[in-house]
């Protein structure tokens, strides 16, 4: 049994290498180069020691301490990520504080989409730029190669990654091993580079170079891209495999490679043009470019899958309209493909690649998205530590202030890059934030209008008993979001058809602030009268609502509904924009557009289409 557990843990650790660490694992391709090039710093030993020390201790403080030691503790029943953290943070807060937490979480999620666009662009471009090291004449092929790889990657998404995903872990294990070996080879030739392990070199560099050193932090943070993935992917692998992979292979591989690049620059300052690929001997350049391209594809796949997962969570939590979701694996519920998100990402990535043309230009855009998300995570972590865990204020404030100062320094160092490309994730973030907040606000107003117009359910049932209508055989299930009002579809059915079914079931599907709902808490069945029942089905934000599955569970609870004798009634609302206060006109137009393009409720809740009756209803916004 113990051997089996060890094998399972080893398998999860290997799998985590392929998914969690792809992004941060490809950072050595461009980070050290950008630290020097962005500020035109000379490659002197003091500068090399200072920048290496900043990179190394940033990895220790931000990744090892903040994320691995602390943030991974803030799991929402095993799940991580900005949406899970937001749901956890708002769970125990007051109504006034809840909306502020939601706004923070939504903007953090919006910045992640910017990251999902920039990561494939910058990582694949940086791998393709290795061709320039092979021969200066190959420069013209860099952009076409990057575009070809990216188009191929997005075209393959619809087929799923279940099979090729099995190779991700072993490939990244080889990648980190080679990172370490290449770096160690140079360190042996220039052991003096290990002086940079002393944090005093980082302090000296910052004090001697002043404002220029501060701005260099904007490039140092590139070494931390992908740190958020440690937390976001916790639900797939668990804390222990993620921690083991980090300390056993990822951190040593990254550390050795960065120090190896520094050692190379000490012996050959001209190698700054591409210190990563120049670590490799000439005969290994082409295989190294191929491996780097594969590693960047894996890193890109991780953020693309993350974008699908985040969108699905946003839909279930009510911050995004329903979109088409395809399952690409019979075994893993998390393996999904979302056509709209896929093609939107592809178009955005290609526009970014063809606009910026090289990884150095894109590096400026990268930092804002990464540091913004890191800072928001720190803020939400404070709320969880203080409110959920009830940490004493000095402890919660002390730890989060330490992280906050580091995050703020990195973010501030990137602000000056707004004109050079930093505007890209900010514009993307604001656009996506506007869409998500508009959808949430619009749905809240819509539900409020429906509640105001709805008849009280108890009075309605009492009147039906006093003046019974004609009855027809079978069961009618009315899907409704309101608990105490009469569904519009029920009123319209009674008004136009003048009949009711023998059994009337009012079914509400609710998404909770937790990833998974225990099976014994899934259903709540209440008989309201001789012919009326209420069924409440609860799902977590990582689960998939399924109405047929709810019927099966009802049968197990003793409340049977034969599918072929059951009709499902839904309201199909036509939303009309009005001058009512509460929502700006331009937001109303956006909301109407999103509503028209949302996936039908019958498809989203997997209601059998041949058993559905839709009744129109007009609602004023």
Swiss-Prot record:
It comes from Chromobacterium violaceum (strain ATCC 12472 / DSM 30191 / JCM 1249 / CCUG 213 / NBRC 12614 / NCIMB 9131 / NCTC 9757 / MK). This is Probable potassium transport system protein Kup 2. Pfam families: K_trans, K_trans_C. It catalyses: K(+)(in) + H(+)(in) = K(+)(out) + H(+)(out). It is found in: Cell inner membrane. GO terms for molecular function: potassium ion transmembrane transporter activity; symporter activity. Keywords: Cell inner membrane, Cell membrane, Ion transport, Membrane, Potassium, Potassium transport, Symport, Transmembrane, Transmembrane helix, Transport. PANTHER family: LOW AFFINITY POTASSIUM TRANSPORT SYSTEM PROTEIN KUP, OSMOTIC STRESS POTASSIUM TRANSPORTER. The keyword Cell inner membrane applies. Transport of potassium into the cell. Likely operates as a K(+):H(+) symporter. The keyword Transmembrane helix applies. One of its GO terms (cellular component) is plasma membrane. It is a multi-pass membrane protein. Belongs to the HAK/KUP transporter (TC 2.A.72) family. The chain crosses the membrane at residues 9-29, 48-68, 101-121, 136-156, 164-184, 210-230, 246-266, 275-295, 336-356, 364-384, 393-413, 418-438. Its main location: membrane. Disulfide bonds: none annotated. Coiled coil: none annotated.
